[in-house]
Design a protein with these regions (language model features):
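Extracellular hydrolytic enzyme modules, especially secreted metalloproteases
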Residues: 83-239, 250-252
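Intrinsic-disorder/low-complexity accessory segments
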Residues: 232-266
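Active-site-proximal segments of metallohydrolase catalytic domains
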Residues: 1-110
Length: 266
């Protein structure tokens, strides 16, 4: 999915240290119940510290001995940091275990002395609702994409048109503005009268969007893009119809997010 929406510019390499040489998975299960790892007032740092402490103890006790040297070599000699660690928590998508992305600044290390940078906590409850799409959403946070939904469900300024606003079972393309913010696409400005041709957002070449600027606001502009409703199982299957969409972008909004009630994209 990431390779597709980035026009092949981002290739995500996923490593599964719990997978043996025959391709079978022996799940790494941490001791205790999920509530034992629940955040308190100190927040996510406490949760991640407990997870890494439990992993380290399992490693010391030989519980992780099923991991072969060849499997761990995918981490050996890296830059000293695991870019993104995904943790599955069995249970409802609620409270401290609502699926989310966070950064960890602790000094604990695992597997060849590697520190953890970003991590994605994924509840099995959210997987039941949104399938692998929720994994895409949280990993896009790791890559730098902001939330485009409203916290508290107060309005839907973007809706199903961007993966960072709604998470259907099959992921949709992010808006071209989001892909541009991540450095994957450029959006030319339509500054003179004339005929302009848009390639659909799902295309791999051509202009996927045009910017329309106004003299009324320096930090605000409109974006025009063309979306095509796809077949079941394909990205963009959940958009309601094919057609032209126009949205406003306000670069003055802090953190370029809709989450806190302001409209970065509307």
């Amino acid at each position: 999915y990431i390779r597709t929406i980035s026009d092949g510019q981002v290739q995500v390499n996923c490593y599964y240290p719990q997978e043996d040489e025959n391709g079978l998975v022996t799940t790494i299960v941490l001791p205790g119940k999920s509530i034992d790892y629940q955040n308190s007032a100190t927040g996510d740092a406490e949760f991640m510290g407990k997870v890494l402490e439990a992993l380290t103890k399992q490693e010391q006790d030989g519980i992780l001995a099923n991991l072969t040297a060849g499997q761990l070599d995918v981490w050996n000699g890296a830059d000293g940091c695991i870019d993104n660690l995904t943790i599955l928590v069995e249970g409802e998508n609620a409270g401290a275990f609502t699926s989310h992305k966070s950064n960890y600044g602790g000094t604990e290390t695992i597997c060849y002395g590697l520190r953890v940078s970003a991590y994605n906590l994924i509840s099995t409850g959210s997987l039941n609702l949104s399938d692998y799409s929720v994994v895409c959403h949280e990993f896009l946070h790791t890559l730098g994409a902001p939330d485009l939904y409203r916290n508290g469900k107060n309005g839907t300024p973007v809706g199903v048109w961007d993966q960072m606003a709604q998470v259907p079972p099959t992921p949709q393309y992010p808006l071209v503005q989001t892909r541009s913010d991540l450095g994957w696409l450029t959006m030319p400005e339509a500054s003179v009268s004339g005929d302009y041709t848009l390639a659909p957002a799902t295309a791999t070449s051509g202009n996927r969007a045009y910017v329309l600027k106004t003299q009324l606001a320096e930090d605000e502009y409109f974006v025009v893009e063309y979306r095509q409703k796809k077949n079941m199982g394909e990205y963009d299957n959940y958009v309601p119809e094919s057609g032209l969409i126009v949205y406003r972008v306000n670069k003055a909004v802090p953190d370029h997010t809709n989450r806190d009630g302001n409209n970065y994209i509307y």
